């Protein structure tokens, strides 16, 4: 009698994806983030579902319904803060996952990488719309500022913004449609994740050396299921410490004030995970230019396969590119800091310099360093 695991039409798919999947024997903990992102997505969908049971998407009651969830619903405070901080954990894992892909040259798997870039855009859109739902001051003004950016599109801009708003300002119609989109998008993300995995399993995983690992594969279970379990433990511990001890550490105090269209907060800023892109947007004085720079700050990832000039896939044996990579990481941290600062001297010039260096490193310096390293390698042989 054959094993049901290998014959049943449905179980067979799970078996080939998570149990008998041939995986390289040398993948490090940087490869844990895929499974952690899956866990984050599950947490967000489950907590979001329970929040949606008590939330009302009406401008007059939205803020009160969130207060009601925290005060009156059984463990409502826990569900709400797990959802809010779960988003932060999601983005931490996302950035580390993308960073790993850049460092080890995973972007050479074109289909997997491009689906990943689409996923990143979709998750960012979902998080933005979710931030609007509590209908606090920063929710309202964040929605107003970000949606208003679309008015920079020539000819159709203003009409497009009013179409998205469902009126002449951010109001009830906007909140209702944002709630609808925020509810449906995680399921679209789940579908995209399946496609992402489908393409990944066509080629198999990359590994730290960037070399072909077909000659040295081990089954995913038990080796990497146990390894992933450690990551799950660390992630859940970090999330629960954040939720139970510092629930408001990453949120804006302004969002505890109900939305008031007549009172603008002194500093309008998005959640911390959008600050780097927000800093790039603000560093360009022209509105359309800023919007294009904002989009390009993420879309640039899709060009990485074409900007790869080295004969080696991974950065592990490429010291010059390694140095540039870590300068890029530091640069992103500077941009994140600048995004949270007011628009005044010296923050404006720091933001502009950081934005220029962000694009320069990716578009010019890294491809040039790849060519230089290849030449040095050729001369040393």
Curated annotation (Swiss-Prot):
Heme b b562 binds at residues 83, 182. The chain crosses the membrane at residues 33-53, 77-98, 113-133, 178-198, 226-246, 288-308, 320-340, 347-367. A ubiquinone binds at residue 201. One of its GO terms (molecular function) is metal ion binding. InterPro entries: Cyt_b/b6_C, Cyt_b/b6_C_sf, Cyt_b/b6_N, Cytb/b6-like_sf, Cytochrome_b, Cytochrome_b_C_euk/bac, Cytochrome_b_N_euk/bac, Di-haem_cyt_TM. One of its GO terms (biological process) is mitochondrial electron transport, ubiquinol to cytochrome c. It is a multi-pass membrane protein. Binds 2 heme b groups non-covalently. It is found in: Mitochondrion inner membrane. Disulfide bonds: none annotated. Heme b b566 binds at residues 97, 196. It comes from the Eukaryota. One of its GO terms (cellular component) is mitochondrial inner membrane. The cytochrome bc1 complex contains 11 subunits: 3 respiratory subunits (MT-CYB, CYC1 and UQCRFS1), 2 core proteins (UQCRC1 and UQCRC2) and 6 low-molecular weight proteins (UQCRH/QCR6, UQCRB/QCR7, UQCRQ/QCR8, UQCR10/QCR9, UQCR11/QCR10 and a cleavage product of UQCRFS1). This cytochrome bc1 complex then forms a dimer. Heme 1 (or BL or b562) is low-potential and absorbs at about 562 nm, and heme 2 (or BH or b566) is high-potential and absorbs at about 566 nm. Component of the ubiquinol-cytochrome c reductase complex (complex III or cytochrome b-c1 complex) that is part of the mitochondrial respiratory chain. The b-c1 complex mediates electron transfer from ubiquinol to cytochrome c. Contributes to the generation of a proton gradient across the mitochondrial membrane that is then used for ATP synthesis. Belongs to the cytochrome b family. This is Cytochrome b. It comes from Chrotomys silaceus.
């Amino acid at each position: 009698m054959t094993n049901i695991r290998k014959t049943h039409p449905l179980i067979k798919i799970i078996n080939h994806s998570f149990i008998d999947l041939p995986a390289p024997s040398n993948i490090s903990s940087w490869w844990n983030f895929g499974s952690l992102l899956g866990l984050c997505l599950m947490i967000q969908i489950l907590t979001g579902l329970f929040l949606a049971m008590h939330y009302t998407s009406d401008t007059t009651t939205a803020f009160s319904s969130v207060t009601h969830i925290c005060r009156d619903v059984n463990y409502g405070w826990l569900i709400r803060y797990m959802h809010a901080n779960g988003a932060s954990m999601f983005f931490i894992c996302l950035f580390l996952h993308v960073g790993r892909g850049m460092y080890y040259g995973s972007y050479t798997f074109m289909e997997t990488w491009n689906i990943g870039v689409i996923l990143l855009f979709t998750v960012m859109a979902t998080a933005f719309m979710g931030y609007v739902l509590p209908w606090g001051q920063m929710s309202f003004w964040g929605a107003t500022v970000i949606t208003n950016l679309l008015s920079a599109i020539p000819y159709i801009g203003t009409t497009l913004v009013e179409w998205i708003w469902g009126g002449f300002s951010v109001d009830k119609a906007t909140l209702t449609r944002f709630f609808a989109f925020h509810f449906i998008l995680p399921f679209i993300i789940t579908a995209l994740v399946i496609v992402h995995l489908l393409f990944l399993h066509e080629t198999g995983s990359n590994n730290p050396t960037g070399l072909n690992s077909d000659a040295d594969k081990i089954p995913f279970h038990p080796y990497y299921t146990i390894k992933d379990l450690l990551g799950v433990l660390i992630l859940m511990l970090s999330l629960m410490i954040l939720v139970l001890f510092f629930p408001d550490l990453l949120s804006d105090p302004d969002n505890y004030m109900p939305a008031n269209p007549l009172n603008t907060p002194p500093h309008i800023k998005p959640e911390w995970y959008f600050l780097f892109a927000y800093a790039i947007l603000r560093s360009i004085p022209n509105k359309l230019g800023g919007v294009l720079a904002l989009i390009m700050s993420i879309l640039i990832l899709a060009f990485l396969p074409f900007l790869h000039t080295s004969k080696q896939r991974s950065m592990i044996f490429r010291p010059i590119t390694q140095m540039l990579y870590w300068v890029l990481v530091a640069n992103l941290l500077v941009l994140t800091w600048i995004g949270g600062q007011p628009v005044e001297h010296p923050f404006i010039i720091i933001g502009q310099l950081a934005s220029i260096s962000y694009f320069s490193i990716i578009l010019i310096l890294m491809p040039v360093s790849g060519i230089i390293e290849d030449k040095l390698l050729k001369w040393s042989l």
